[in-house]
Amino acid sequence: MGAKEVKPTRSELIELKKKIKLSEGGHKLLKMKRDGLILEFFDILSKAKDVRSELDAAYEKANVKIGIAESVEGRITIKSTAFAMKDAPQIVLESHNIMGVVVPKIESSSVRKPINKRGYGLLGTSSYIDEAVDSYEELVEKIILAAEIETTMKKLLDDIEKTKRRVNALEFKVIPELTEAMVFIRLRLEEMERENTFRLKRIKKA
């Protein structure tokens, strides 16, 4: 809105004051939201670093355990045990709200199973296979948790950028333009008032 595009009337001046007040209120709320989202992001980033370290450790552990199991039991036994495993883990995708941003919550409590619920026979298999399965169940849990956290971080980053753009638009474009238009109308009304006063004085003198 250019200053010269507005009508220099008192009603327009009142309307502009309302718009400025509303824009300033919105600007304040958006800044609070942006700052809150940034704090949330860095809090989750700290957790993400821990989870990433845990994921790397779980991956290394799983590789070691499966290597030991293969060397003791043989690859064929490991494969037949894997094929005997029953029921893929139930993954339930839910969501929750962080300052207006909907982020995923993945429920994966069924990943870890008791030994007697895994599907392969307990007789004829050693504890090395059980340990390998344990380590891979742990790895899957870490992968799911890492996916949840990284998706949350991406969504928060997207919303932080969107909120920053809105804050900047209000701060550097909308509010300055409205203020400029308000000042223009004020000055124009004062000028018109002086002209009217001068005109009335001339009429009285005449």
Swiss-Prot record:
Tell me one GO molecular function of this protein.
Answer: proton-transporting ATPase activity, rotational mechanism
Q: Does the keyword NAD apply?
A: no
Q: Which UniProt keywords apply?
A: ATP synthesis, Cell membrane, Hydrogen ion transport, Ion transport, Membrane, Transport
Membrane disposition: Peripheral membrane protein
- Domain of life assignment: Archaea
Q: List, alphabetically, the GO terms of the cellular component aspect.
A: plasma membrane
Tell me the Gene Ontology biological-process terms attached to this UniProt entry.
Answer: proton motive force-driven plasma membrane ATP synthesis
Note the PANTHER family from the entry: V-TYPE ATP SYNTHASE SUBUNIT D
Q: How does it assemble?
A: Has multiple subunits with at least A(3), B(3), C, D, E, F, H, I and proteolipid K(x).
- Into which family does the record put it? Belongs to the V-ATPase D subunit family.
What is the designated name of this protein? Answer: A-type ATP synthase subunit D
State the organism named in the record: Methanococcoides burtonii (strain DSM 6242 / NBRC 107633 / OCM 468 / ACE-M)
